[in-house]
C-alpha cells in the first residue's frame, strides 16, 4: 500500500516591506497604520518562523489580494509618547543555498543597537546549524514616538504563495 505524501505550502518568492504608524487612540491602531504604510494591512497575516525555503527568490513588493492568507516573518515594536522603538529583520542564505535564515529584533532599540542585535542573532542562528552564511541583508525601522500618541514600527518578510 502506498503512503500518501503530506502536502506542504512552499513559497517560491518573498519580499520585504516596512512601515511606521502613529495613533492618538490606541497601540493597536498605530499597528494598523504601520501595516497600512507597509502595504499589508488588508491581508490576513500568518506569522511563521524564520526559514526561507531553497530556491525561494527575493522580489519587489507585490500587491496582495484583500483577505489573502499571507505568511510573514515579522518584527514589530509598539511604544508610548517619547519612547524610541525599533524593529528589524536580517536575512541571509546558507553558503550553498540550501536555505535562508531570518532573524527578528523588536523593542526599545535605537538604530545602532538594532543593527548590533540583528547581526548577533543571524550569526548565532547560523552557528547553531553549523552554517556559513553569505550576504547578510537588513531592513529596519526606528522611531521616536511623538508626544500624545502611540507609535508602532513593523518590518515583514512576506512570502508569496
Question: Where on the chain are the PLM-derived regions?
Answer:
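Helix-coil modules at protein/domain termini and other flexible surface or pore-lining loops
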Residues: 1-161
Amino acid at each position: 500500500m502506498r503512503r500518501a505524501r503530506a502536502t506542504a505550502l512552499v513559497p517560491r518568492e518573498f519580499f520585504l516591506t516596512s512601515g511606521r504608524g502613529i495613533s492618538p487612540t490606541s497601540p493597536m491602531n498605530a499597528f494598523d497604520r504601520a501595516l497600512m504604510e507597509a502595504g499589508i494591512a488588508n491581508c490576513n497575516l500568518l506569522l511563521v518562523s524564520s526559514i526561507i525555503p531553497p530556491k525561494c527568490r527575493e522580489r519587489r513588493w507585490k500587491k496582495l489580494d484583500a483577505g489573502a492568507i499571507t505568511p510573514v516573518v515579522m518584527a514589530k515594536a509598539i511604544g508610548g509618547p517619547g519612547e524610541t522603538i525599533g524593529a528589524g529583520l536580517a536575512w541571509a542564505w546558507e553558503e550553498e543555498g540550501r536555505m535562508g535564515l531570518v532573524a527578528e529584533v523588536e523593542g526599545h532599540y535605537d538604530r545602532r543597537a538594532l543593527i548590533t542585535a540583528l547581526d548577533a542573532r543571524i550569526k548565532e542562528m547560523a552557528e547553531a546549524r553549523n552554517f556559513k552564511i553569505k550576504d547578510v541583508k537588513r531592513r529596519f525601522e526606528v522611531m521616536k514616538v511623538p508626544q500624545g500618541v502611540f507609535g508602532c514600527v513593523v518590518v515583514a518578510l512576506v512570502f508569496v504563495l
